[in-house]
Each structure stands twice: as C-alpha cells, then as structure tokens.
C-alpha cells in the first residue's frame, strides 16, 4: 500500500497525506508532514491557472486536490479560533506536534479549500461537495494573526512564539509566510494590515540565508511590491562563494552556479 494512502488511514481519515521524504513509487519515510499535501495541490492549481487546461484540471489535478481536502475534512478539530489542524509544527523551527492552528498548516488548508472550490466551479461539478468546503472555510482558522511586535504570528501560543519566532530570529524558513508566497492569501492589494505584518516578519528573518531561502525571501519582497528590496536579495543570492562548510546565513553561488552552502534543491 502506498505510504501516502497509509498515512491518511493511520490518522483515522480518508484521502491522502505524505511524509517528509517521498519517492517516485509512492513511498516515504522518517516523519509525516501533513500540510504538504495542500502545498503540492497549490502547484497543481497554479498549473491550471497558467494554462487554463480544463482537461488537465479534470483528469489530473482535481481528483488529487479533492483527496487532500478529504484528508483535512476528516482531521480538522474545533478550537476557540475555529477549525484547526491538530498537533502541527512550523518547518523547520520549534517543537513538533504540540500545537493546533500553526500558521503554516492553516494557511495551506485555506489555500487548498479555496482553490478546490474554484475548481468545482470551473468544471461545473460536485455542487454538494463545494458547499461543504465553503461551509468549512467559514469556520476555518485562516492562520493570520498579528503578534506583539507587529509580526505575522508563526504559532498560536505566545510563549512558543516568543521563544522560536522572535524579532531577532534569522531562521532560513518562512513557513508562516506561505500565504504571501507561493500562496496568494496575503497581498498589499488585499489587506495592508496582514501584508505589513508579513513585512515585519520578513525584516526579522533578515536578508542573509541559504541559497534557496534567499530565493524565497526575494519572492516575498516582490509580492509586497518592493522591487528594490527584491533586487537586493537577488544580488545577495548571486554573491560568489568558495566556502565548503555548512552555514545557514552565507548563501550565494559557486563557480558552477550551484547554490550553497549547503547545496539544497
């Protein structure tokens, strides 16, 4: 049985989920990263929006998106802030499986449900299922909360937030900003309060990191309509480096144009 199917059954729900590491045969290992099913589906939907290929949407993307929705419809639980994903984490920072409603998971689930609703409208199918998703979206915690220093909160719990996501934490990951990029829930064209909070979080994370993390920062600044800052990040990411030691705040490119250190895809 493929790991992506077994992962959902192990969690007592239907649909599919996956592990941190997965191979082309449908198997994975190490640990679960449940919200990544929504992240995968984000790119399926984006492929449709760029191509407008209804055949692709109907035959390939939609059934995968619907399966991911089935998983979350069965896993979400009630909380004071609304429906939340229980026992989640914020890759790759902070404690594992201790808090429900982590921004990373909530933002991805909102994106998944919203895009799947749009898919049913485009394909003119599954009206009852669409209505179920719409009703769930109304009760869903969207993963957008502004914290004490004006940041977009990564965690619900203030103590965890203060310890792991403070204003001087220059961690490479921007998991709580996935609604800004590659998602589209946050934008200065939609709501300046949340886009300003995302900007504050970006400033806290800093402009120096690994190669891939600089690319993520660059894209986030572009989404905030700050071309000058995005250009600076582009220059930072193209700095020539020669070091072979593992470091997380000196990203750049080697002479062969591979990024690092460390090299990651």
Give residue ranges: language-model regions:
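Acidic/histidine-rich catalytic neighborhood
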Residues: 67-122
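Core alpha/beta catalytic barrel or barrel-like domain that forms the active/cofactor pocket
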Residues: 12, 17, 33-46, 81-83, ...
């Amino acid at each position: 049985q493929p790991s992506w199917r077994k992962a959902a059954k192990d969690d007592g729900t239907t649909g599919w989920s996956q592990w941190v590491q997965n191979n082309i045969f449908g198997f994975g290992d190490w640990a679960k990263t449940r919200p990544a099913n929504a992240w995968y589906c984000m790119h399926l939907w984006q492929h449709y929006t760029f191509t407008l290929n209804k055949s692709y949407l109907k035959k390939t993307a939609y059934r995968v998106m619907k399966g991911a929705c089935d998983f979350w419809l069965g896993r979400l639980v009630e909380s004071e802030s609304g429906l939340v994903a229980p026992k989640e984490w914020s890759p790759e920072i902070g404690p594992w499986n201790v808090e429900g409603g982590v921004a990373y998971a909530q933002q991805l689930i909102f994106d998944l449900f919203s895009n799947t609703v749009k898919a049913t409208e485009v394909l003119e199918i599954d009206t009852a299922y669409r209505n179920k998703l719409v009703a769930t979206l109304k009760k869903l915690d969207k993963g957008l909360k502004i914290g004490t220093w004006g940041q977009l909160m990564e965690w619900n719990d203030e103590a965890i937030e203060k310890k792991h996501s403070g204003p001087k934490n220059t961690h490479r990951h921007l998991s709580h900003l996935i609604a800004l990029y590659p998602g589209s829930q946050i934008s200065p064209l939609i709501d300046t309060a949340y886009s300003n909070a995302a900007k504050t979080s970006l400033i806290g994370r800093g402009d120096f990191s690994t190669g891939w993390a600089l690319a993520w920062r660059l894209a986030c600044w572009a989404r905030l309509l700050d071309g000058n800052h995005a250009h600076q990040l582009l220059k930072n990411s193209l700095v020539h480096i020669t070091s072979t030691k593992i470091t997380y705040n000196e990203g750049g490119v080697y002479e062969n144009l591979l990024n690092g250190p460390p090299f990651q895809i």
